[in-house]
Amino acid sequence: MDQLIQLVEASEARNDFPAINPGDTVKIQLKVIEGEKERLQAFEGVVISDRGAGGSKTITVRKISHGVGVERIIPVNSPNIESITVLKHGKARRAKLFYLRKRTGKAALKVKARKVVEKA
């Protein structure tokens, strides 16, 4: 039974996205269907949590919109995701950045920058 589940998850997994870690600032293009029309909606914010593995992996992205904090839980393997772009890599010393919820203003999105060395 476990082999069957792993086989299905492997066939559904998407590998076309970059590595995403808590603290990274990402821009996610989501497909939104309204009636018969389909359009792309951008959601840009800081990854405060990632959870699960394989087909059930999700990330929580937080942004400040007109002074109000907005969080969205996004399944990484969803077919409604068009693209994920990492805008900035953040240096976080924790796996969950829930302390950002208590901050207001500019400090609510402030995470130290991380230098990224790309492997050839």
UniProtKB/Swiss-Prot annotation:
One of its GO terms (biological process) is translation. InterPro entries: Ribosomal_bL19 (IPR001857), Ribosomal_bL19_CS (IPR018257), Ribosomal_bL19_sf (IPR038657), Translation_prot_SH3-like_sf (IPR008991). One of its GO terms (molecular function) is structural constituent of ribosome. Pfam families: Ribosomal_L19 (PF01245). One of its GO terms (cellular component) is cytosolic large ribosomal subunit. The keyword Hydrolase does not apply. Keywords: Ribonucleoprotein, Ribosomal protein. Signal peptide: none annotated. It comes from the Bacteria. Belongs to the bacterial ribosomal protein bL19 family. This protein is located at the 30S-50S ribosomal subunit interface and may play a role in the structure and function of the aminoacyl-tRNA binding site. This is Large ribosomal subunit protein bL19. It comes from Chlorobium phaeobacteroides (strain DSM 266 / SMG 266 / 2430). The gene is rplS.
